[in-house]
């Protein structure tokens, strides 16, 4: 109830207030002053009788009651399609068009705008229509509008207030009644407010255009006769809908204000009505209406649809040249850098570098992106105001230019140019000259690079087959050539000056090796290095880690021996640093190794602790061996400017050369078949185990002499030397058969033929054995060839065991084709494992390492048990073989076969038992005391072994004794420990070998313990 009473009371008070106001408006200024004094916070100058009613008085100021439900806050004044002509405005425009058609064109001239004669410069209307919504104070209107005694409403106000009845408005316009100056003073802002309010409230929807609006558009776009009027109020448009595409694009966007207006509404209307000489009020109304329409439809235009500026230099705020240029020239770098994108320019070029890792370059590409002014001599070139903005040009080129799929040899070059206040013609001439010079320089560099790629000697790497295929100018921080074989040699980047241009340019130095290797042609160096300081780039990791310093002759050599091969990175390109080389620890930290697999050899390890350092000490004269005609062994001669320290050879090559000097009979073609292993563990050397065809052949032909064994080793073991070798032999070797050499070499072909016939191809026969050796968890020697540890070949053990037995063993050896040809008179050929084991334990880099363990570990053990050789059981290969055998026994894959016939060979036994599954190892051993034979068969799968144990007895022939099969191991060679498992008691040693407590049972041990306590 209280709320309703208050609402009713408020309605009554407001109604009485508005009635008093409407009655006092006829009284002139006194009534208005009284109302303003009573309610100073309300601006009543915009109120009218048609605007009020008790229901909607709390709403906003309205033009028409129908538009009160639309909220103006939902529209943004910046919307380009905000101001549209709706149905009500179409009615207004129809009335105005009908009125304007009757007006002769002579009346619409300079006389219609008297304020222009006085030289007034109207100010630009703000971009947003919101400030125009604010009503001016009554005091300001009082100053602008003098008082008048006329009481009737003006013709323009009647027309605008009666928008719903266009016919009545047109009739009222023809009457030409006089209007009150006081009423005009209190409502001079009203047309602007009505336009603003309506435009804010209407939905920006496109509607069909009516014909009267088209006629009004024709009239309003007619060319005015006076140029000053044309310049002051440019050709307006009634609606954004009537603009074409071309006009939308040609709108002047550089004017800070969205449109020019002849004058603000209050000024124009007040000054039109302020002249006391106006004798024809209808004519003044027409002028004011024309001015209002021009203002309204220019005000409705968005910023991009404004008409173009007039070319005449009228002192206007919008068309002023200084105002046009000022927004552009105020912050030119900001506009420039918003358009310039580093990543876009980098991706546009075909650059073989990772731009996200600038630390991998000698000079990061981002260091050149700072715009630098060109240091040209200042010339008297006063630029006009139109050319006051400085033009900047950023060129990103790769030197030389990429002319196809061939990658560029030089890294990115960024050239930032800035032309400051140059005349157009002079600037063009200078640019053309500079472009010609740059093109000539780039052509020269390209020719030099092609010559550099052609004349650089091949290094045996894949990319040297194509002379110009230099893959990259980025050197990741690695230390091994084996891990990065595709990386090229050192690339030295220099800071190349191009005339007076200080922009950075990374360039590779070229060198010529035509006449003499290592000699540097002074022409290319003198042409490239007179001014720029050499900046040593990252040293190629394949050179630094492996010790092969086939250095680029143009690379500067530091005087210090310690830092001669360290990684060097230029921290700055300033002249103060010059050619200073930095410490290794600092530069590696700066380079970083992000994204790389952590190597076992740390990159920060000093060069003196080279993990690839060979054990064999070589003199400098031994670096060039005549037996290895490879380009890799050709060192570059030291240049006068470089250090006189001889380049350090690759350790693996050096070790290989040392072996080749002793074993000169090794064909050169086999030297590169298998990579010699390093003595120590290096960068992922276990990934580099190669298996060429020669290695597979050596694996099968284990009884043959090792390929790369030293002469002294061959002499120690009494092995026959090849024909080319004239070294003396031991006396023990003189009793051998004279046809020993020929039979060895001839038997090679026989062995290969027989093995291929029986086992098939070499790869398939050896595949299973290799997999078995690699799957073992005890496979702790990663460099060791699987053939070294899997020397338990089936066709060697039996013949080695039967050497002492005489003719039967010799015949059986001939049957197998691999038995040593020496008879009983010839001292037995000790297993080549003694000498070759020493070689293997010293260094596994010998190419004959696969034949080090060519004799079975079990056979070695048998020899050791019977004191037939001084071979040691502690070599890694023997321990490894024992572990593998124990693992196979534990998995149940070893089958022990007893009671074999005397003529049974390992080949025959394996052939019979292959029906159960794949056999990894087959041995036939002879008991020396009794002459009985037994065998061991190791299957790959335990299921196959179990099947052979169950059904293996059925494989015997009629004249053969029955087989006794069981799971077993090498128990018969371990009598002290396995006496209880032996089939016969006489084979066991006397039981006295046992201790006292081992022979006692538990009760006896308990009694003995109790007695000892007392």
UniProtKB/Swiss-Prot annotation:
Residues 128-138 have a biased composition (Pro residues). It is found in: Nucleus. The modification Phosphoserine is found at residues 145, 148, 384, 519, 630. A motif (LXXLL motif 1) lies at residues 140-144. InterPro entries: Nucleotide-bd_a/b_plait_sf, PGC-1, PPARGC1B_RRM, RBD_domain_sf, RRM_dom. Residues 1-91 are annotated as: Abolishes DNA transcriptional activity when missing. Residues 178-189, 264-278, 317-327, 520-534 have a biased composition (Polar residues). Keywords: Activator, Nucleus, Phosphoprotein, Repeat, RNA-binding, Transcription, Transcription regulation. SMART domains: RRM. Residues 113-138, 165-212, 227-283, 307-331, 369-477, 516-563, 592-653, 715-745, 780-886 are annotated as: Disordered. Residues 624-640, 784-796, 836-856 have a biased composition (Low complexity). Disulfide bonds: none annotated. Residues 412-429, 606-616, 726-745 have a biased composition (Basic and acidic residues). A motif (HCFC1-binding-motif (HBM)) lies at residues 683-686. One of its GO terms (biological process) is estrogen receptor signaling pathway. One of its GO terms (cellular component) is mediator complex. It comes from the Eukaryota. Contains 3 Leu-Xaa-Xaa-Leu-Leu (LXXLL) motif, which are usually required for the association with nuclear receptors. This is Peroxisome proliferator-activated receptor gamma coactivator 1-beta. It comes from Mus musculus (Mouse). The lineage of its organism: Eukaryota, Metazoa, Chordata, Craniata, Vertebrata.
């Amino acid at each position: 109830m209280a709320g309703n009473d208050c609402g009713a009371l408020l309605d009554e008070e407001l109604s009485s207030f508005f009635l008093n106001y409407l009655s006092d408006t006829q009284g002139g200024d006194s009534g208005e002053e009284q109302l303003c004094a009573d309610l100073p916070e309300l601006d009543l100058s915009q109120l009218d009788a048609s605007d009020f009613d008790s229901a909607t008085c709390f709403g906003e100021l309205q033009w028409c009651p129908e538009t009160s439900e639309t909220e103006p806050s939902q529209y943004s004044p910046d919307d380009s399609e905000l101001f549209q002509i709706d149905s009500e405005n179409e009615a207004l425009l129809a009335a105005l068009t009908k009125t304007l058609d009757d007006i002769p064109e002579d009346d619409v001239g300079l006389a219609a705008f008297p304020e222009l004669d006085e030289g007034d410069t109207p100010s630009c209307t703000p971009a947003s229509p919101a400030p125009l919504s604010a009503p001016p104070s009554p005091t300001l209107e009082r100053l602008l509008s003098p008082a008048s005694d006329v009481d009737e409403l003006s013709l323009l106000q009647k027309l605008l207030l009666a928008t719903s009845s266009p016919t009545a408005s047109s009739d009222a316009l023809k009457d030409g009644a006089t209007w009150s100056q006081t009423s005009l003073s209190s409502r001079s802002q009203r047309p602007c407010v009505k336009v603003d309010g309506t435009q804010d409230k209407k939905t920006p929807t496109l509607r069909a255009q009516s014909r009267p609006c088209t006629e009004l558009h024709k009239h309003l776009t007619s060319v005015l006769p006076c140029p000053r009027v044309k310049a002051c109020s440019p050709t307006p448009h009634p609606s954004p809908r009537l603009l074409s595409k071309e006009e939308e694009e040609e709108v002047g966007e550089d004017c800070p204000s969205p449109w020019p207006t002849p004058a603000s509404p209050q000024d124009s209307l007040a000054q039109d009505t302020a002249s006391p000489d106006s004798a024809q009020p209808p004519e003044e109304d027409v002028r004011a209406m024309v001015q209002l329409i021009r203002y309204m439809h220019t005000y409705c235009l968005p910023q991009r649809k404004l008409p173009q500026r007039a070319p005449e230099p009228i002192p206007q705020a919008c068309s002023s040249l200084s105002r046009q240029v000022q927004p552009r020239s105020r912050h030119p770098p900001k506009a420039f850098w918003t358009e310039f994108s580093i990543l876009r320019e980098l991706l546009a070029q075909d650059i073989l570098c990772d731009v996200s890792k600038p630390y991998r370059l000698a000079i990061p590409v981002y260091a050149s992106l700072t715009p630098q002014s060109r240091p040209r001599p200042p010339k008297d070139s006063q630029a006009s105001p139109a050319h006051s903005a400085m033009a900047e040009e950023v060129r990103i080129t790769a030197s030389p230019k990429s002319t196809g799929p061939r990658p560029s040899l030089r890294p990115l070059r960024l050239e930032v140019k800035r032309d400051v206040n140059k005349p157009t013609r002079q600037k063009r001439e200078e640019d053309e000259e500079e472009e010609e010079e740059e093109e000539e320089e780039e052509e020269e560099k390209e020719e030099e690079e092609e010559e550099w790629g052609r004349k650089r000697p091949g290094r045996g790497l894949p990319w040297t087959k194509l002379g110009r295929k230099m893959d990259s100018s980025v050197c990741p921080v690695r230390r091994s050539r084996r891990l990065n074989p595709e990386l090229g040699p050192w690339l030295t980047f220099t800071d190349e000056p191009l005339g007076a241009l200080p922009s950075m340019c990374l360039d590779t130095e070229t060198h010529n090796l035509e006449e003499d290797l290592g000699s540097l042609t002074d022409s290319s160096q003198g042409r490239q290095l007179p001014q720029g300081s050499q900046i040593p780039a990252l040293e190629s990791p394949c050179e630094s880690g492996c010790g092969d310093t086939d250095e680029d002759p143009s690379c500067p050599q530091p005087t210090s021996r310690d830092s001669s091969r360290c990684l060097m990175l230029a921290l700055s390109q300033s002249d103060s640093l010059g050619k200073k080389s930095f410490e290794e620890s600092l530069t590696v930290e700066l380079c970083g190794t992000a994204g790389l697999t952590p190597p076992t050899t740390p990159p920060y390890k000093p060069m003196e602790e080279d993990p690839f350092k060979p054990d064999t000490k070589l003199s400098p004269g031994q670096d060039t061996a005549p037996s290895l005609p490879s380009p890799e062994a050709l060192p570059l001669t030291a240049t006068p400017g470089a250090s006189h320290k001889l380049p350090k050879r690759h350790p693996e090559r050096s070790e290989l050369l040392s072996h080749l000097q002793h074993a000169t009979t090794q064909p050169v073609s086999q030297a590169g078949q298998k990579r010699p292993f390093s003595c120590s563990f290096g960068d992922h050397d276990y990934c580099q185990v190669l298996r060429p065809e020669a290695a597979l052949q050596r694996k099968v032909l284990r009884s043959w002499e090792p390929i790369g064994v030293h002469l002294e080793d061959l002499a120690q073991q009494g092995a026959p030397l090849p024909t080319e070798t004239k070294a003396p032999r031991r006396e023990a070797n003189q009793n051998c058969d004279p046809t020993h050499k020929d039979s060895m070499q001839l038997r090679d072909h026989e062995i290969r033929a027989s093995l291929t016939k029986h086992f098939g191809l070499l790869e398939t026969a050896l595949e299973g054995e290799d997999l078995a050796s690699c799957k073992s968890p005890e496979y702790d020697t990663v460099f060791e060839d699987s053939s070294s540890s899997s020397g338990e070949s089936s066709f060697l053990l039996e013949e080695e065991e039967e050497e002492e037995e005489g003719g039967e063993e010799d015949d059986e050896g001939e049957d197998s084709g691999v038995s040593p040809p020496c008879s009983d008179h010839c001292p037995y050929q000790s297993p080549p494992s003694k000498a070759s084991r020493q070689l293997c334990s010293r260094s596994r880099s010998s190419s004959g390492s696969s034949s080090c363990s060519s004799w079975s570990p079990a056979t070695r053990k048998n020899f050791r048990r019977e004191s037939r050789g001084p071979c040691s059981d502690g070599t890694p290969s023997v321990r490894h073989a024992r572990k593998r055998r124990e693992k196979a026994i534990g998995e149940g894959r070893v089958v022990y076969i007893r009671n074999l016939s005397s003529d049974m060979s390992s080949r025959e036994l394996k052939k019979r038992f292959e029906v159960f599954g794949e056999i990894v190892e087959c041995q036939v051993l002879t008991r020396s005391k009794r002459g009985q034979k037994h065998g061991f068969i190791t299957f790959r799968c335990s299921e196959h072994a179990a099947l052979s144990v169950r059904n293996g007895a059925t494989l015997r022939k009629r004249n053969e004794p029955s087989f006794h099969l069981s799971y077993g191991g090498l128990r018969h060679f371990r009598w002290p420990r396995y006496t209880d498992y032996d089939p016969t008691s006489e084979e066991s040693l006397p039981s006295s070998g046992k201790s006292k407590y081992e022979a006692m049972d538990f009760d006896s041990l308990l009694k003995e313990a109790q007695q000892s306590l007392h």
